Amino acid sequence: MSKLVLILNCGSSSLKFAILDPATGEEKLSGLAEAFFLPEARIKWKLNGEKGNADLGAGAAHTEALNFIASNILNDELKNSIAAIGHRIVHGGEKYTQSVIVTDEVVKGIEDAAQFAPLHNPAHLIGIREAFKAFPHLKDKNVVVFDTAFHQTMPEEAFLYALPYSLYKEHGVRRYGAHGTSHYFVSREVAEYVGKPADQVNAIICHLGNGGSVSVVRNGQCIDTSMGLTPLEGLVMGTRCGDIDPAIVFYLYKTLGMSMDQIEETLVKKSGLLGLTEVTSDCRYAEDNYDDESKPETKRALNVYSYRLAKYIGAYMAVLGDDHLDAIAFTGGIGENSAHVRELALNHLKLFGIKIDHERNLATRFGKDGVITTDDSAFKAIVLPTNEELVIAQDTAKLCF
């Protein structure tokens, strides 16, 4: 068996894992351990096409999950074929512009950037430490892949906020972006789709899932993106508000008497589609009930969501200027599967000569890729499934094999 990469994506209460062959992209194992620290902590997986699941035990967390993977899921052949471990890291700050092998200095850098990703980076560090314990023979073969790295090519006019400059120089307050691994992968897929070298492609990429972001790519490099200092800025998301007037925070604090913790919870966990529907953060609910007059919240939510998305796409078309836009790409759970969201958003952009093909759009869902605009559309819109795990596996292999 060829050299394989174990991929870990640690959240505060969950752990996604996979084993890939970086040379072929073949997935040997995928799974999710979830409900950490709760009585119902559990793990589910698919190994060589066969599904399995198990209880991890009340209160189980990252340690128990990784030990279970190593001891109960992996057979000897698969375990012996794992030659390196790749970790997804949400925030690398300004320091990291590419993937690196884990060292004490790198761990310190991830800790320093945790102030901008307090829910994610500490969990990633737990994953790294537990991987060292579960696979001690691979301690020098752990690689971190940063979601912020792809966006580090943004020019100053894109990443600076109009705040006192000292906040940037002394405290690192600037736009960093997120979902960079996905944006990188899809930008390369666009290049292949339109028959251009990756370093010549110009694209607008819409990664739409429970979290969502848009980036604009010129000559293969990111020049702007919608998420900011944290993943709260930008698009309407599942539970996150995206762009708002910053003075709303003052109003909630001073006039409504909300604490800063309550305000943070409102903006991060109670807003977005959940806030607009007052029912759910699931886009499918809004899509399925869009025309139901007894549920006006669904149309309200989806219209706000798609309008915000269209504004970003239109703005980024302007940012490209004279550089020809090769394609608008949709990816992520909503981007790949919600024909309705794509159509609502693109219909706002008819001024640019974009014409969506209704039948193509409906046919391009559930893992299918393809062009969803008409042949005479001024610009192509394409659906392209993302594969962040493959990027992590390939980056890890480059550094370790």
Curated annotation (Swiss-Prot):
ATP binds at K16, H207, L208, G209, N210, G211, D282, C283, R284, G333, I334, G335, E336, N337. The record marks H179, R240 as: Transition state stabilizer. One of its GO terms (cellular component) is cytosol. Keywords: ATP-binding, Cytoplasm, Kinase, Magnesium, Metal-binding, Nucleotide-binding, Transferase. It catalyses: acetate + ATP = acetyl phosphate + ADP. Its cofactor is Mg(2+); Mn(2+). It comes from the Bacteria. Its EC number is 2.7.2.1. It is found in: Cytoplasm. Mg(2+) binds at N9, E388. Substrate binds at R88. GO terms for molecular function: acetate kinase activity; ATP binding; magnesium ion binding. GO terms for biological process: acetate metabolic process; acetyl-CoA biosynthetic process. InterPro entries: Ac/propionate_kinase, Aliphatic_acid_kin_short-chain, Aliphatic_acid_kinase_CS, ATPase_NBD. The active site is at D147 (proton donor/acceptor). Mg(2+). Can also accept Mn(2+). It is an enzyme of class 2 (transferase). Pathway: Metabolic intermediate biosynthesis; acetyl-CoA biosynthesis; acetyl-CoA from acetate: step 1/2. Catalyzes the formation of acetyl phosphate from acetate and ATP. Can also catalyze the reverse reaction. NCBIfam families: ackA (TIGR00016). Belongs to the acetokinase family. HAMAP family: Acetate_kinase. Homodimer. This is Acetate kinase. The lineage of its organism: Bacteria, Pseudomonadati, Pseudomonadota, Gammaproteobacteria, Pasteurellales.
